[in-house]
Amino acid sequence: MPNPTVAIVGLGALGLVTLKNLREEGFDAVGLDRNDYVGGLWHFEEGNKLTVMRSTLSNGSKQRGCFTDFPFPEDSPDFIPAEGIDRYLKDYAKHFGLLEHCRLRTSFHGARYDEKKQQWRLSLSTPDAPEPHFEWFDKVVFAMGADQIPSRPKIEGIEKFKGHVEHSMSFKNPETLAGKRVMVLGFGNTAADMATELAPIADQVYLAHRHGAIIVPRWVKGKPVDHVRTYRKYVILNLMNRYTPGLWEKTMNSVIGKLVHNTFDLKPEWRFDPAPSITNQRPLVNDELIPSLEKGSIISTHGLARVIDENTVETSDGQRYEVDAILFCTGFTVDYSVVGMDADPCRATTTDWQKSRGFTGRPLPRLYQNIFSLDHPETLAFIGHLSFMNPAFFMFDLASMAVAQLWKDPSGFPSKAEMNKQVDDQHAWVIDLAKKGPVTPSIVKASEWMEWVDRVIGSGLPEHLGYTMKGWNFWMRDRKFCNIMMDGLLSPHAYRVFPGKRKAWPGARDAIIAMNADREARFGPMD
């Protein structure tokens, strides 16, 4: 019997790791991408494409931000520039022999499930065959992420504005706005990056935002800010999150709040406070924003309310500003209707989401564990609708391992009623968060999701690093390495150390030891 065929739509970081993990488990998987390269948004390109800017820098360190079985090169800086991540993804594809299974310059137009054939019919085209044609696959993974369609809030009077108006998706060359007065809309990582990129060359940058933000630097006391996580701390925090979520939230907000205020002298007029809770939104990571605000090259304003005339805008507090350009750094949304209305995970989502205070325009799809279609859990998955305080490459490596394992052995799926209940509970939690303010709809309860994925992929970590017979045996047999696993920097490679359902990586042990030795030599012992 031939291996099941799988189409993976998108060959950025999400698609590549999914392709690798599915092929590793014996699936006849291919990746499809309209571009002539792999790497997705990490491959810089001019024009109206969603890509990084040339100056983009990773928000997480190389030690924490890699895939589970493929470290960044040793000579990489601790925070990787966009060009380095693009190269890393291409090296990943070559190392695991993925390129021969990548169909580039292939545009995806839609998919429909055929009940008779029990297969998915995909509509595809290429430059050589521009007319869409059909191809059949047993399973489909959408790995295009949640950032697909630019989101632009309606601004009263915008048609009167005679200056430059652009969404961050297509803005790649800050030099075009040199000497201009620019208003940047938004208060996330993209808005902060755009504003600080423009600050040295623009006449004035206004950063317009409606709410506060948690801002953290990349470096604290000479160490990468994410070099605090150990497995022991992870277990303790997960227990708090599960059994005393209110205390966990209060503790995390307090710890991060102290870090922020010990690092930066935040002025009230910058309006970082009140910041959203860490449960609602991930921190903004930027090293240049505060210095630019201090110098006055960036001025923090209230949110843009309306355009008055060809160059005059008014913010929600009634202040008026003369500007030459407006940049929308207001995020993206996603359209899942490409799988047909019968399978669109957003078609029957709760209307309470759109009514909530924290609704940001993004949909809230009904996906089991934020991955699997409830209509076709054994054949349709979405990689990218997932967010919590963990590095993205690591999270989606785990998520795609879960897809591979559950599609390999579907008996691991709970009943349809149980899957629906999990989604109902997840949505109720997200909507409750949205009562406090803006919330990322892809956010999940970290402790519950990690416990689930540990079990599904068979990582072996809870058994070998817990108070079990396997745990005691591991400690007695390999005490030094056990101690590194428990109290050294928690590495993504830990999830490939022990044998289990997913494939272990023989190099995981050496990689963890080498990484911790290098980290200690350069930064000292773990705090």
From Swiss-Prot:
Signal peptide: 1-19
Induction pattern: Expression is regulated by the aurofusarin biosynthesis cluster-specific transcription factor aurR1/GIP2.
This protein's record includes keyword Chloroplast: no
Pathway in which this enzyme or protein is active: Pigment biosynthesis
Keyword match 4Fe-4S: no
Disruption phenotype: Impairs autofusarin biosynthesis and leads to a yellow pigmentation via accumulation of the intermediate rubrofusarin.
Cofactor(s) for this UniProt protein: FAD
Keywords assigned by UniProt, alphabetized: FAD, Flavoprotein, Glycoprotein, Monooxygenase, NADP, Oxidoreductase, Secreted, Signal
SUPFAM superfamilies tied to this protein: FAD/NAD(P)-binding domain
Example of a GO cellular component annotation carried by this entry: extracellular region
A GO term for molecular function: N,N-dimethylaniline monooxygenase activity
InterPro entries: FAD/NAD-bd_sf, Flavin_mOase, Flavin_mOase-like, FMO-like
Chain positions carrying an annotated carbohydrate: 59
Subunit structure: Might be part of an extracellular enzyme complex composed of GIP1, aurF, aurO and aurS.
Stated role: Monooxygenase; part of the gene cluster that mediates the biosynthesis of aurofusarin, a red mycelium pigment which is acting as a mycotoxin. The first step is performed by the polyketide synthase which condenses one acetyl-CoA and 6 malonyl-CoA units to form the first intermediate, the cyclic heptaketide and yellow pigment YWA1. The C2 hydroxyl group in the pyrone ring of YWA1 is probably formed during ring closure by an aldol-type cyclization reaction. The dehydratase aurZ then acts as the first tailoring enzyme in the aurofusarin biosynthetic pathway by converting YWA1 to nor-rubrofusarin.
Protein family per UniProt: Belongs to the FMO family.
Protein name (Swiss-Prot/TrEMBL): Monooxygenase aurF
Origin species: Gibberella zeae (strain ATCC MYA-4620 / CBS 123657 / FGSC 9075 / NRRL 31084 / PH-1)
Upper taxonomic lineage: Eukaryota, Fungi, Dikarya, Ascomycota, Pezizomycotina
Gene name for this UniProt entry: aurF
